[in-house]
A protein has these predicted regions:
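Glycine-centered loop/turn positions within well-structured domains
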Residues: 10, 35, 79
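N-terminal strand-loop-strand
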Residues: 1-14, 41
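The catalytic Nudix box helix
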Residues: 14-48, 72
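NUDIX/MutT-family hydrolases
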Residues: 71-73, 82-113
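Active-site-adjacent beta-strand/loop module that shapes the phosphate/pyrophosphate-binding cleft
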Residues: 50-80
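Residue-level structural signal for beta-strand termini and adjacent loop
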Residues: 7-9, 25, 87
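A short, polar/proline- and glycine-enriched secondary-structure boundary/capping micro-motif
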Residues: 12-16, 92-95
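Acidic/histidine-enriched, glycine/proline-rich intrinsically disordered or flexible terminal extensions
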Residues: 116-121
Length: 121
């Protein structure tokens, strides 16, 4: 799993962000993958939708939000891995069974679901 260490909270997470005007959810996911990691998604699969208390997040500036997360899995991509320097400290591949401890709290449930899915396959 390719993760990014963010510059704002210094925690690991996946590429993501807000939907811009006129974009679909999938277009936004593809754009964020390219902007933050330099990769172009060839195929994406809707994996998980997450909302509620477990998506509560407090930004380093004190802003509090509840996110709605629509998670895609991208297994086929092309391009050269390149981090977005303003938002990303580091990009690194991890084995899904060896995810770092310092991942952002709101994405922990997503990884739990991903691990469950892999065990069913």
């Amino acid at each position: 799993v390719l993760l990014e260490k963010r510059t704002d909270n210094h925690q690991w997470g996946y590429a993501g962000g807000s939907i811009e005007l006129g974009e679909t959810v999938e277009e936004a996911a593809k754009r964020e993958l390219f902007e933050e990691m330099g990769l172009v998604a060839d195929e994406m699969e809707l994996f998980y939708i997450n909302s509620g208390e477990e998506t509560h997040y407090i930004y380093p500036n004190g802003d509090e939000v509840y996110n709605v997360e629509i998670i895609y899995i991208c297994r086929k991509y092309h391009g050269t891995i390149k981090r977005q320097e303003e938002e990303v400290e580091e990009l690194k591949f991890f084995d899904v069974d060896d995810i770092p401890e310092d991942i952002s709290d709101p994405i922990r449930p997503v990884f739990r679901e991903y691990i469950k899915m892999r065990k069913r396959e």
